[in-house]
Amino acid sequence: MSVFFPHADFKRIYQIPTEFFQQRGLTVALLDVDNTLTTHDNPTPHKEVLGWLERKLNSGLRLMILSNNTQERVAPFAEGLGLEYIADAHKPLGGPLRQALGKLGVRPEETAVIGDQIFTDILCARLAGCTAVLVEPMEPEPMAFFRVKRTLER
């Protein structure tokens, strides 16, 4: 299978059931922020996402944010949720993802990477041997570069 194809896809992150993780032996989910947990520049997740995060944590799934966005954007967002994070992750490069796995003490086979972009989130997950989960972006991309990239992803 191509490194550009996710193992699974969902419209929104909050539509991924707990059983999805349990049936695959996944104990960790690494989460993108913008257009996955919330819209760009929004300091808090949508209420449906908050409920999803709580249900996943209560199920025993460990969550961590892995974002290409800046420390200034990611830190307050993650800290507000009580989640560990890695900002400036440079996905699809695998260094920060391997750092996250080491920090959490898990193997790639136990880990899902969830995000809205094929050329960053999905490629990063596939190259590392993690389960790649694609969600649709929460809103259209505001910048021309991202709009072109989205067209290529389709």
Q: Where in this protein do the model-derived segments appear?
A:
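Asp-based, Mg2+/Mn2+-dependent phosphohydrolase catalytic module
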Residues: 2-31, 42-43, 47-154
